């Protein structure tokens, strides 16, 4: 069971793609998907063990910062089931 959720929010698509690539390459996490927030903001989400998700978010944030602007990043260990209901379903 994946027990953590990692989020990296960027300004622009290039930063989001770079973050997603770095996250899945740097740790044993699964890419859940992305959400277009508006005004060019895109949030990329990954799931996995807490340690792996923390490492992935750090790597994704650093990679996205190199090519664009990171607005926010966060790790939620063990999200509540009510939060799970609003997340995209992983494959």
UniProtKB/Swiss-Prot annotation:
PANTHER family (alphabetical): BACTERIAL MICROCOMPARTMENT SHELL PROTEIN PDUJ (PTHR33941:SF11), PROPANEDIOL UTILIZATION PROTEIN PDUA (PTHR33941)
Keywords tagged on the record: Bacterial microcompartment, Transport
BMC domain residues: 4-88
Complex formation: Homohexamer with a central pore. Interacts with PduP, which targets PduP to the BMC. Interacts with shell protein PduA.
Source taxonomy: Bacteria, Pseudomonadati, Pseudomonadota, Gammaproteobacteria, Enterobacterales
Alphabetical list of InterPro entries matching this protein: Bact_microcomp_CS, BMC_dom, BMC_shell, CcmK-like_sf, CcmK/CsoS1_BMC
Main subcellular localisation: other
Pathway(s) of this molecule: Polyol metabolism; 1,2-propanediol degradation
Protein's recorded name: Bacterial microcompartment shell protein PduJ
PROSITE patterns (UniProt xref): BMC_1 (PS01139), BMC_2 (PS51930)
Biotechnology note: Artificial BMCs can be made in E.coli by expressing pduA-pduB/B'-pduJ-pduK-pduN-pduU-pduT (in this order); pduT and pduU are optional, while pduA, pduB/B', pduJ, pduK and pduN are essential. A construct with the reversed gene order does not make BMCs. Ethanogenic BMCs can be made in E.coli by targeting pyruvate decarboxylase (pdc) and alcohol dehydrogenase (adh) to them. PduP(1-18)-Pdc and PduD(1-18)-Adh strains targeted to the BMC (PduA, PduB, PduJ, PduK, PduN, PduU) make significantly more ethanol than strains where Pdc and Adh are not targeted to the BMC.
GO biological process: propanediol catabolic process
Family: Belongs to the bacterial microcompartments protein family.
Protein location: Bacterial microcompartment
Protein purpose: One of the major shell proteins of the bacterial microcompartment (BMC) dedicated to 1,2-propanediol (1,2-PD) degradation. At least one of PduA or PduJ is required for BMC assembly; it must be encoded as the first gene in the pdu operon. Required for structural integrity of BMCs and to mitigate propionaldehyde toxicity, probably joins facets responsible for BMC closure. Probably the hub for binding multiple enzymes to the interior of the BMC. Expression of a cosmid containing the full 21-gene pdu operon in E.coli allows E.coli to grow on 1,2-PD with the appearance of BMCs in its cytoplasm. Overexpression of this protein leads to an internal structure with a whorled architecture.
Domain of life from the UniProt record: Bacteria
A GO CC term assigned to this protein in UniProt: bacterial microcompartment
């Amino acid at each position: 069971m994946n027990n953590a959720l990692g989020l990296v929010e960027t300004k622009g698509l290039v930063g989001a793609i770079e973050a997603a690539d770095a996250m899945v390459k740097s740790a044993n996490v699964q890419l859940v998907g992305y959400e277009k927030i508006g005004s060019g903001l895109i949030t990329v989400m990954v799931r996995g063990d807490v340690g792996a998700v923390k490492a992935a978010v750090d790597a994704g944030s650093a990679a996205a910062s190199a090519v664009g602007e990171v607005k926010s990043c966060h790790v939620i260990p063990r999200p509540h089931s009510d939060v799970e209901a609003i997340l995209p379903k992983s494959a």
